[in-house]
């Protein structure tokens, strides 16, 4: 099956705040919590240079199989020597991307300073079973104010690769959280009003999948490469 790849640049919030619970300086490890969230649940569509009524999404989930972290680790800030390390979390887990708690999993970090960080998230059809790897549903409102149900079903393997900005460092005396935002506006980039008005409907619903409205599916599938929106903060 085809693999969808995505590079997301992490934005580092410099003004990090300490958590309400004080950390024990002698603790054996810290953690990096990895979350995924879908942003922009409602937005308009482009028609001949102007915006028209568009999408309102109500359900979005992904079946995540694995999270891998790779980084360069130093014992402390002044150390000149570094070691390439890898950590791994394995699921699978169905994550509600519109939910308050969209946590995928926690990666344990041994004490030290980490930079050149990359996080790889993989979602395999073999782990999803009868469920989609990625699922998005809601409605499309056309120019005459008629709401039409829309469903996007991705059953290909998905691989998301997250890379930190140059200069980003994690000091593992603290816990951290990375929030990966899938920007739904960017995911639907290139989908026009005319595309949806002419789309095939199944029982009154626009189903976008590998077997239904394939041209729209191909556009959306390609857009996973450019949904670049994320946050990185101390937990």
What label would you give each PLM region?
Residues 22-235:
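A short, solvent-exposed, low-complexity linear motif enriched for acidic/polar residues
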Residues 1-8:
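Bacterial N-terminal signal peptides that target proteins for export
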Residues 17-20:
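C-terminal motif of bacterial Sec signal peptides marking the signal peptidase cleavage site
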């Amino acid at each position: 099956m085809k693999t969808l790849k995505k590079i997301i640049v992490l934005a580092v919030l410099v003004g990090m705040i300490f958590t309400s619970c004080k950390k024990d300086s002698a603790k054996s490890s810290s953690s990096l919590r990895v979350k995924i969230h879908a942003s922009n649940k409602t937005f308009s569509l482009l028609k001949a240079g102007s915006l028209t009524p568009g999408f309102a999404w109500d359900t979005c989930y992904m079946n995540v199989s694995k999270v891998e972290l790779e980084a360069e680790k130093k014992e402390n800030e002044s150390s000149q020597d570094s070691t390439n390390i890898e950590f791994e979390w394995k699921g699978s887990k169905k994550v509600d991307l519109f939910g308050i708690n969209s946590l995928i999993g926690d990666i344990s970090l041994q004490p030290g300073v980490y930079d050149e960080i990359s996080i790889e998230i993989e979602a395999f059809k073999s782990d999803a079973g009868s469920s989609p790897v990625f699922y998005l549903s809601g409605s499309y409102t056309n120019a005459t104010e008629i709401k039409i149900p829309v469903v996007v079903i991705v059953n290909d393997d998905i691989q998301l690769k997250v890379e930190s900005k140059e200069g980003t460092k994690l000091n593992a005396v603290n816990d951290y959280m990375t929030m990966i935002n899938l920007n739904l506006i960017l995911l639907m980039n290139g989908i026009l009003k005319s595309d949806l008005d002419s789309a095939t409907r199944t029982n009154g619903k626009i189903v976008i999948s590998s077997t239904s409205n394939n041209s729209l599916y191909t556009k959306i599938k390609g857009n996973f490469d450019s949904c670049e929106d994320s946050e990185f903060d101390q937990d």
